[in-house]
């Protein structure tokens, strides 16, 4: 399932084609995805201008000129495809002709951009685990999907001091604490494994046991920020279904230090250990027992 870097990459890919554009019409090819589409979904979007594209945790948000917002989640296999004349040469792009919709193209946004050029933004989702919901004017931050989300792990929002406060008194393992969306929003299995390796911390260690060690908290916060920033710069990680909005694959998976590397040498040159895999809360955890303590 796409994590924060993948969703941010999609947002950045869509932004030049969607922000400022007017929705001419929307093709809705089925009544539901994971959830039913909002009532009058296509009708309420027609004629609206897209003012901004945002992201909160793993959710893409589309903000319209009447105050309505779309909250979208890619699920397991969702992707957006851009078709526009100036997308010529990009995977999924077209020039002087309209491509044929595929079986799993469930929503097509027909847009008129500020310069008068047209574009189509196509949402494709074979497994249909994604969704698109509305948040009414002024209600986005209090939407049930968003209101309880924790701090974003980007920029300077996440610090050692913040982590220490979040982890204080918590008995759950570090990995479980980092995956708790109420504490830190947008982190997933891949990037938590990678950040813990960079910080030299065991995923099984109790979160509260390190909350008082400010140097450790700063090291972990820095590891999280750097992993997320590098993954965004690499276009995310393509393991199964994820592609960028222009059809390209992310390539951060080539930089994995532990994730998916069970039995292979640890990439810490001072270590000499081997990457191990254990299951925590039903998810695979990859780590090096030699250098993560």
UniProtKB/Swiss-Prot annotation:
**According to its UniProt record, which cofactors does this protein need?**
Zn(2+)
The residues responsible for catalysis, as annotated, are 2-3, 58, 283
Q: Which Pfam families match?
A: Fapy_DNA_glyco, H2TH, zf-FPG_IleRS
Q: What keywords does the record list, in alphabetical order?
A: DNA damage, DNA repair, DNA-binding, Glycosidase, Hydrolase, Lyase, Metal-binding, Multifunctional enzyme, Zinc, Zinc-finger
> Could you tell me what reaction this enzyme catalyses?
Hydrolysis of DNA containing ring-opened 7-methylguanine residues, releasing 2,6-diamino-4-hydroxy-5-(N-methyl)formamidopyrimidine; 2'-deoxyribonucleotide-(2'-deoxyribose 5'-phosphate)-2'-deoxyribonucleotide-DNA = a 3'-end 2'-deoxyribonucleotide-(2,3-dehydro-2,3-deoxyribose 5'-phosphate)-DNA + a 5'-end 5'-phospho-2'-deoxyribonucleoside-DNA + H(+)
Positions of FPG-type zinc fingers:
257-293
Report residues binding DNA. 104, 127, 170
- Where does the chain cross the membrane? none
Cofactor binding note from Swiss-Prot or TrEMBL: Binds 1 zinc ion per subunit.
Q: Might you give the EC number(s) for this enzyme? A: 3.2.2.23, 4.2.99.18
One GO BP annotation of this record:
base-excision repair
Q: Does the keyword Translocase apply?
A: no
Mind telling me which InterPro entries this protein's record contains? DNA_glyclase/AP_lyase_DNA-bd, DNA_glyclase_Znf_dom_DNA_BS, Formamido-pyr_DNA_Glyclase, FPG_cat, MutM-like_N-ter, Ribosomal_uS13-like_H2TH, Znf_DNA_glyclase/AP_lyase, Znf_FPG/IleRS
Subunit record text: Monomer.
Q: Which family does it belong to?
A: Belongs to the FPG family.
Briefly, what is this protein's role? Involved in base excision repair of DNA damaged by oxidation or by mutagenic agents. Acts as a DNA glycosylase that recognizes and removes damaged bases. Has a preference for oxidized purines, such as 7,8-dihydro-8-oxoguanine (8-oxoG). Has AP (apurinic/apyrimidinic) lyase activity and introduces nicks in the DNA strand. Cleaves the DNA backbone by beta-delta elimination to generate a single-strand break at the site of the removed base with both 3'- and 5'-phosphates.
Q: What is this protein called?
A: Formamidopyrimidine-DNA glycosylase
Species assigned in the record: Brucella canis (strain ATCC 23365 / NCTC 10854 / RM-666)
